[in-house]
Amino acid sequence: MSDRISVVLAEDSLLVRDSVVRALSTDPDVTVVGVAEDYDAAVALVAERSPTIVVTDIRMPPTSTDEGIRLARWMRTAHPHIGVIVLSNYADPGYAAGLLERGTAGRGYLLKERVARFEELHDAVHQVADGGT
């Protein structure tokens, strides 16, 4: 891949945040260009940095409910060219249903337990960067 994939990470858990950044740093095609701990900071970073992809927790402040899905929906309207990967502890496909609708560049849903498998995270990032799901 000739173009680097730029990533904004939105995750409130320090442990998960560090794990994702560490995993992504092992991929020579990927650069993490910003890290946010909540929805508002993520919106500001996306607007400022215009990354290739946003990797976001499904639940984060300020409400700790579905801020990641809210972020993905906002991006679908405001920045439809930016891909989204939502991270979750929940295997329930209902959490991903709204995300996987048409309208965003690439999109994905990845269980947090898979982040430890660097290759799976790398594959997801590359697939979403290429417009896939």
Question: Residues of each region from the PLM?
Answer:
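Non-catalytic signal-transmission and effector/linker regions of two-component phosphorelay proteins
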Residues: M1-S6
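Conserved acidic carboxylate
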Residues: E11
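Two-component/phosphorelay signaling modules centered on CheY-like receiver
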Residues: L14-G34
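Acidic, metal-coordinating helix/loop segments flanking the phosphotransfer/catalytic sites
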Residues: V35-I53
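Short amphipathic alpha-helix used as the core "switch/output" element in two-component signaling
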Residues: A44, T65-H81, A97-R102
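Active-site residues of response regulator receiver
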Residues: D57, S88
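The short loop immediately C-terminal to the conserved phospho-acceptor aspartate in CheY-like receiver
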Residues: I58-P62
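C-terminal output helix
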Residues: G94-Y95, E113-A129, T133
